């Protein structure tokens, strides 16, 4: 399969003395895409499909991919404030914000703080809230679960889509390790959620689509339904035969759902 952490893209974006590697695709309506637990492979099919309908920019978060992380940059709120700055640099007055997995948490936080720069919001298998009791985990602890089990629960068809680490280049392996380290730094405690976010999701006033892989074993569809119910007017949709990465396993269905939402 296509690995999820290929070599650096050529483009860079400088914001507030932080330099981010970015992927750009397409023309038209502006879309800011925030990646999940791994940075986005520029060969991913969904990029070209979505780029056929929108002008998309997909940065690698500081510490992920080939984006450097400043020494004092270590919380989700550093990321949120960075992307608030990124929104101010984009030429469009309003953009569609799409967040995948961990990036969905960031997107929700940004939308709570800054709806005036957002046209529409798409959350895809997003982290960020706590819906169960204190003793019941909502999100699989990927750091304390065997790699084999993480892969099994990440994909509808892991035999087809799980990354082959033996086939990765040295650069890809280094990037994947950097991604894992950065994810742990930003999201370890509390694990992948903000205790206050659930209360403030009511502040999101822009049209919102919550997309979920029907076979997601990292964070179950029931979590996605609960997430959607906390955002006024949000719509929840499942993508069949997809796990935690519907943009990879079902790129056509993923893009079709987003384009239909944008066209409404």
Task: Go through each PLM region and give its residues.
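Conserved HGGG/HGGXW glycine-rich cap/lid loop of the alpha/beta-hydrolase fold
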Residues: 16-66
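Active-site loop/oxyanion-hole signature of alpha/beta-hydrolase fold enzymes
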Residues: 57-98, 248, 256
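Flexible "cap/lid" loop of the alpha/beta hydrolase fold
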Residues: 105-113, 119-149
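Hydrophobic, aromatic-rich cap/lid helix
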Residues: 170-199, 203
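Short beta-strand/loop motif that positions the catalytic acidic residue
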Residues: 204, 210-212
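Acidic catalytic loop of the alpha/beta-hydrolase fold
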Residues: 215-219
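Catalytic active-site module of serine/aspartate enzymes centered on a nucleophile-bearing elbow/loop
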Residues: 234-264
């Amino acid at each position: 399969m296509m690995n999820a952490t290929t070599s650096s893209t050529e483009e860079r974006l400088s914001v507030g003395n932080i330099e981010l590697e970015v992927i750009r695709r397409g023309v038209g309506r502006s879309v800011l895409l925030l990646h999940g637990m791994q940075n986005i492979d520029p060969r991913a099919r969904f990029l070209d499909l979505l780029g056929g309908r929108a002008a998309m920019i997909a940065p690698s978060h500081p510490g992920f991919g080939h984006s450097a992380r400043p020494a004092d940059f270590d919380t989700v709120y550093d990321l949120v404030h960075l992307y608030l700055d990124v929104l101010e640099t984009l030429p469009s007055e309003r953009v569609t914000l799409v967040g995948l997995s961990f990036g969905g948490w960031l997107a929700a936080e940004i939308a709570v703080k800054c709806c005036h720069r957002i046209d529409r919001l798409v959350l895809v298998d997003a982290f960020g809230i706590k819906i169960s009791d204190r003793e019941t985990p909502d999100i699989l602890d990927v750091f304390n679960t065997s790699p084999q089990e993480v892969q099994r629960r990440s994909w509808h068809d892991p035999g087809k889509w799980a990354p082959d680490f033996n086939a990765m280049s040295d650069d890809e392996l280094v990037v994947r390790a950097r991604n894992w380290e950065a994810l742990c730094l930003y999201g370890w405690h509390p694990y992948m959620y903000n205790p206050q976010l659930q209360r403030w999701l009511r502040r999101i006033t822009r049209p919102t689509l919550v997309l979920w892989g029907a076979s997601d074993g990292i964070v179950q569809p029931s979590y996605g339904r609960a997430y959607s119910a906390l955002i006024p007017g949000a719509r929840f949709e499942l993508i069949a035969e997809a796990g935690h990465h519907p943009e990879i396993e079902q790129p056509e269905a993923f893009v079709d759902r987003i384009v239909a939402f944008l066209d409404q």
